[in-house]
From Swiss-Prot:
Superkingdom, taxonomy of origin: Bacteria
Subcellular location: Cytoplasm
Region (Disordered): 349-370
Protein name per UniProt: Phosphate acyltransferase
Keyword terms, alphabetized: Cytoplasm, Lipid biosynthesis, Lipid metabolism, Phospholipid biosynthesis, Phospholipid metabolism, Transferase
Gene: plsX
Pathway: Lipid metabolism; phospholipid metabolism
Length: 370
């Protein structure tokens, strides 16, 4: 193990983030670039960086912003995107991903960030961190750009498990509402259950049971249940938290990302078609840049694993430095708000409304009561 400095996971204004530097498609260079950007933006953040010391050492040494802020944990092996979760569970020790999660389990870091294989990361997280008491299926929650004043909605599950029964969906509502309180600064989030229609008679039988459970838990969970919602409500104003199973959520997420890219490509083609359209593009440059920023997937990079004894943020495997920095910023925000402890308290006893609300809201958003 090589380190520039040693530091504690706790302290006034200090947070320690464990980062898997080797699992992404772009390699450690993108992760180190994201670390450097994060170090400038988050003065109180320190990083335990896991991966091949031979590669990481020179990269980190070149970044002045990382001086005294990083400790390298040598991990010679890498979990690839093709590795099966079952294989990683049996033989993953010694990989950068395993080492990254182990730092959270040991209490050296508050939160973990990885760009690696999603299935393997969930498997390693479950066997090393274990599930919170009472949790049947952990979920992955993501931020979805929306028309709400805060700019985002929360959706879960987006791929942790393709199955979810009525009780799982009810638990997702509790976890999603807690995430919205701490990640979006919403005092009383509105929760919607994704269905093929908003009418009471539509949908599978388990969705109707889930609807009753989520509604019954609303007061204890300190959220407002708006009932069934449709796909068109995902980026809309009707709710703040979208609850669904992992299969449906993952398909919706990938469809949304693909649609955003398609729109971006169409705009680029349209404004480059001829001299007049190019002139129009110049005149509309400011507006186009603002639109590009709003639909840029890198800006909302980072899915959060909910329901574990520790916080894990999953970055896109293809994330560049900007995307990695966004995932680290999310991890830092959740660590600063004490999100994990508040979520555990909510799941352990949902009887006291507001017990998982942060003392100071950590991100801009709405805080008015509904």
């Amino acid at each position: 193990m090589a380190s520039e400095t040693a530091f504690q996971a706790t302290g006034a204004g200090r947070i320690v983030i464990s980062v898997d530097a080797m699992g992404g498609d772009r390699g450690p260079a993108a992760v180190v670039a994201g670390l450097a950007e994060s170090a400038s933006a988050i003065p109180g953040a320190y990083f335990i960086v896991h991966g091949d010391e031979v590669h990481l050492g020179p990269m980190i040494a070149k970044r002045k912003d990382l001086k005294g802020r990083c400790e390298i944990r040598h991990a010679p092996r890498v979990v690839t995107m093709n590795d099966k979760p079952s294989q990683v569970m049996r033989h993953g020790e010694g990989t950068s991903m395993w080492s990254c999660i182990e730092s959270v389990r040991a209490g050296e870091a508050t939160v973990a960030v990885s760009c690696g294989n999603t299935g393997a990361l969930m498997a390693v997280s479950m066997i090393r961190l274990r599930k919170l008491p009472g949790v049947n299926r952990p979920a992955i929650a993501c931020m979805w750009p929306s028309r709400n004043p805060g700019g985002f909605n929360v959706m879960l599950d987006v791929g942790a498990d393709i199955k979810a029964d009525a009780e799982d969906l009810a638990q997702y509502a509790l976890m999603g509402a807690s995430y919205a309180r701490n990640g979006l600064s919403l005092e009383r989030p509105r929760v919607g259950l994704l269905n093929v229609g908003t009418e009471e008679h539509k949908g599978r039988a388990e969705l109707k049971v889930a609807q009753d459970l989520i509604s019954a838990n609303a007061a204890a969970g300190a959220y407002e249940f708006v009932g069934f919602i449709e796909g068109g409500d995902i980026p809309g104003r009707r709710c703040d938290v979208i609850v669904t199973d992992g299969f449906t959520g993952n398909v919706a997420l990938k469809t949304g990302e693909g649609t955003a890219k398609l729109i971006s490509d169409f705009l680029r083609e349209a404004f480059g078609a001829n001299i007049l359209s190019k002139m129009a593009a110049i005149l509309a440059l400011g507006s186009l840049k603002r639109l590009q920023k709003r639909i840029d997937p890198r800006r909302v990079n980072g899915g959060v694993f909910l329901g574990l004894n520790g916080t894990v943020v999953k970055s896109h495997g293809s994330a560049d430095g900007t995307g990695v920095a966004a995932a680290i910023a999310l991890a830092a925000r959740l660590a600063q708000s004490g999100f994990h402890e508040r979520l555990a308290a909510r799941l352990a006893s949902a009887g006291r409304a507001g017990q998982d609300a942060p003392d100071e809201m950590a991100a801009p958003g709405r805080s008015e009561k509904r």
